[in-house]
C-alpha cells in the first residue's frame, strides 16, 4: 500500500503587528503631597496624587471646591505660597525636567512660555492700567526676542485668534465684558505657543451662555494648536465638553 503523505503549505511570512505605544509623557506627577499649615490645623490639600499627560492630550481634574485642583496646578509651576503652603513630597517632571529642583531663573523661563495658566477670575490676570494688547505683547517680549512692532503684530494676531478684533488692541480691561476678558487671558496664555496649558476653572465666574462660548473656543484652540491641557472643573460636564480624560481629585 502506498503510504499516505501529508503536504503542508508554507504560510507567507508576515511582520509582527506593532503594539500601540503610549504618548510621550509631557507632564508626570508622582505621589504629590501638598499641605497648608496654620496655627490651629494642617490641611492636607493634595495627598499622593499621580497623573501623566502626554503631548497633545487633555486631562480633566474633577472635584468639589477644596479638593486640591488649584493646588495641583500651582504646584506644577512652584507657585504655592510658602507659608502657609508647602510641597511635602512627590515628584513633578515636565519634559523630563525635575520641576521641584529647578532654579528660580529656570522657572521664570518656563512660566508663560512652556507652561501657561488660565485662572478663574480674569481680573486677577489683567492689569487695569494697561491696554489688553500691550499686556499680551509684554508676555511675548518676556520670552521671545522681537521688536516692539513685531510684538504688537503678534499680540494682534492672538486677539483675532480668540475672536477679538485687532482694532480693540488699545482698549483697557474695564471696556470688556467678563467673557471677553477671559478671551484676552486665553490669548495671553497661548501667545508663546506653550506645550501645556493649566486651566483652573476658567469659566466659573461667567454666566452659562458665556461659559459655553469659552468652552467652545478652548476646544477649537486645543484641536488647532495641539497643546496639552489640564482642565480643573466642577461639575464634570466641562471636561466632557473638552473631550478630557477625567481624573477625580
Where are these regions (language model features)?
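ABC ATPase NBD coupling module
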Residues: 87, 99-116, 134, 142
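ABC ATPase NBD Q-loop/coupling interface
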Residues: 91-109, 147, 216
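Conserved ABC ATPase "signature" region
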Residues: 94-98, 138, 149-167
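Conserved ABC ATPase signature
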Residues: 171-176, 180
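A short, proline-enriched helix->beta-strand linker immediately N-terminal to the Walker B motif
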Residues: 191-195
Amino acid at each position: 500500500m502506498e503510504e499516505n503523505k501529508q503536504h503542508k503549505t508554507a504560510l507567507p511570512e508576515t511582520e509582527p503587528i506593532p503594539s500601540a505605544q503610549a504618548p510621550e509623557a509631557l507632564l508626570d506627577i508622582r505621589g504629590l503631597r501638598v499641605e497648608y499649615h496654620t496655627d490651629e490645623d494642617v490641611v492636607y490639600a493634595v495627598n499622593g496624587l499621580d497623573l501623566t499627560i502626554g503631548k497633545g492630550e487633555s486631562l480633566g481634574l474633577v472635584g468639589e471646591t477644596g479638593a486640591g485642583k488649584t493646588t495641583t496646578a500651582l504646584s506644577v509651576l512652584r507657585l504655592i505660597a510658602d507659608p502657609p503652603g508647602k510641597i511635602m513630597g512627590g515628584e513633578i517632571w515636565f519634559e523630563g525636567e525635575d520641576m521641584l529642583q529647578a532654579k528660580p531663573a529656570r522657572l521664570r523661563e518656563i512660566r508663560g512660555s512652556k507652561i501657561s495658566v488660565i485662572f478663574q477670575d480674569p481680573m486677577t490676570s489683567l492689569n487695569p492700567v494697561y491696554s489688553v494688547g500691550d499686556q499680551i505683547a509684554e508676555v511675548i517680549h518676556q520670552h521671545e526676542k522681537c521688536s516692539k512692532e513685531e510684538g504688537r503684530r503678534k499680540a494682534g494676531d492672538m486677539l483675532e485668534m480668540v475672536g477679538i478684533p485687532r482694532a480693540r488692541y488699545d482698549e483697557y480691561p474695564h471696556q470688556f465684558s467678563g467673557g471677553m476678558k477671559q478671551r484676552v487671558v486665553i490669548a495671553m496664555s497661548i501667545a508663546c505657543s506653550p506645550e501645556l496649558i493649566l486651566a483652573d476653572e476658567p469659566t466659573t465666574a461667567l454666566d452659562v451662555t458665556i461659559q459655553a462660548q469659552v468652552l467652545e473656543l478652548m476646544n477649537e484652540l486645543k484641536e488647532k494648536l495641539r497643546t496639552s491641557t489640564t482642565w480643573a472643573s466642577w461639575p464634570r460636564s466641562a471636561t466632557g465638553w473638552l473631550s478630557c480624560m477625567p481624573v477625580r481629585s
